[in-house]
Amino acid sequence: MKNIAAQMVNFDREQMRRIANNMPEQYDEKPQVQQVAQIINGVFSQLLATFPASLANRDQNEVNEIRRQWVLAFRENGITTMEQVNAGMRVARRQNRPFLPSPGQFVAWCREEASVTAGLPNVSELVDMVYEYCRKRGLYPDAESYPWKSNAHYWLVTNLYQNMRANALTDAELRRKAADELVHMTARINRGEAIPEPVKQLPVMGGRPLNRAQALAKIAEIKAKFGLKGASV
């Protein structure tokens, strides 16, 4: 029951349709299909028990559609292990409202709790770390001299910082990138991979082109810094 990735990949469309619509499965002597079905149904039952107001005044067709959306969300977002599901359920049980979260919210809970279990920050904490690094980086000769709590923190923050600078990321874009970085780093740690120590990195060049106002401001900054004179652009 620890890893159902292979079963989920091989779980054919008809079986998924039958489970989503609360119909009996057709196993064709495939015990792994029954196992996947039991896991999905068990998770859905836990969610409904945790959020009892979710199905109030809903008919069976609506319930079936909710089940279908959850099945699809698990498959599309790689929620393939009971460890991931249990991580999401730990967050779900801490909620103080009786309504079922969206499939996307539950997937985010699975990932966030998995990251925390692996010794990493959650998305909000990681973004705060990036902003703090932006404020304090000038106090240190280089990124490698910054007081990182772990090798993983170094790679997460510096990668996001470079991406933010190169592509002028908004706060919302930075948070999406942070979520992606945490998924990858969590997977590396869970595989037992040794995260390398900080090493000097070349600056990331390129990214989004500047508009005219930004270009003029950058030119003025360079002129002021080096005491240059010349005609305006």
From Swiss-Prot:
Write down a Pfam family by its short name: Phage_lambda_P
Give the matching InterPro entries: P-like (IPR009731)
Q: Tell whether Chaperone is among the UniProt keywords.
A: no
Q: Name one GO biological process term.
A: DNA replication initiation
**Keywords assigned by UniProt?**
DNA replication, Host-virus interaction, Viral DNA replication
Question: Lyase: present as a keyword of the record?
Answer: no
Q: What does this protein do?
A: Loads (host) replicative DNA helicase DnaB onto single-stranded (ss)DNA at the origin of replication. Reconfigures the DnaB hexameric ring, generating an opening large enough to permit ssDNA into the central channel. Necessary for the bidirectional replication of lambda DNA. It interacts with the ori (origin of replication) region of the genome during the initiation of replication.
What does the sequence similarity comment in the record state about its family?
A: Belongs to the phage P protein family.
Q: What is this protein called?
A: Helicase loader
Species source reads Escherichia phage lambda
Q: What is the lineage of its organism?
A: Viruses, Duplodnaviria, Heunggongvirae, Uroviricota, Caudoviricetes
